[in-house]
């Protein structure tokens, strides 16, 4: 694992599909099944936020997971901060503060991971140097 667990999980959460199509036609899955790699990445990141971006806060696992999920969701599918706060039983300002901390942390990791991948591809002459 050249990038490390943190970067790997961030990239998995960003780019892996959260669901796969399911052709079983059973009512239990509604035509799609969850991607275990994506689910595991979200869980890993949610746990990691406890000792990093949300260290020293009272954010429990549900709040951390909601923040991580919200960060990676497409804007059109994203719940508002008010909805997030209501679902987690916290006030809107606290939800906004937690989201801001999580987003800033993940953006730094994503940027570092992209740079590392770009450098590796350049070293292998897969892409040209900028």
Identify the meaning behind each predicted range.
Residues 15, 98-106, 110:
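DNA major-groove recognition helix of helix-turn-helix
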Residues 1-77, 81-83:
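Short basic alpha-helical hairpin corresponding to helix-turn-helix/winged-helix-like nucleic-acid-binding
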Residues 112-130:
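Intrinsically disordered, low-complexity basic tails/linkers immediately adjacent to helix-turn-helix/homeobox/MYB/SANT
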Residues 25, 37, 110-111, 121:
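Alpha-helix boundary/capping detector
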Residues 20, 24, 108-111, 115:
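Charged, solvent-exposed alpha-helical segments that act as regulatory interaction surfaces
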Residues 95-100, 126-130:
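Long, charge-rich, low-complexity alpha-helical segments
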Residues 80-90, 95:
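Short alpha-helical "recognition helix" segments of helix-turn-helix
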């Amino acid at each position: 694992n050249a990038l490390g667990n943190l970067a790997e999980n961030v990239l998995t959460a960003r780019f892996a599909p959260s669901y796969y199509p399911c052709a079983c036609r059973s009512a239990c899955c509604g035509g799609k099944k969850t991607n275990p790699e994506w689910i595991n990445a979200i869980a890993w990141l949610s746990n990691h936020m406890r000792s990093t971006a949300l260290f020293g806060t009272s954010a429990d696992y549900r709040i951390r997971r909601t923040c991580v999920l919200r960060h990676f969701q497409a804007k059109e599918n994203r719940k508002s901060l008010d909805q997030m706060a209501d679902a987690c039983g916290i006030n809107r300002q606290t939800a906004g503060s937690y989201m801001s901390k999580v987003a800033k942390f993940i953006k730094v990791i994503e940027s570092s991971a992209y740079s590392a991948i770009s450098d590796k591809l350049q070293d292998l002459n897969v892409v040209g140097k900028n």
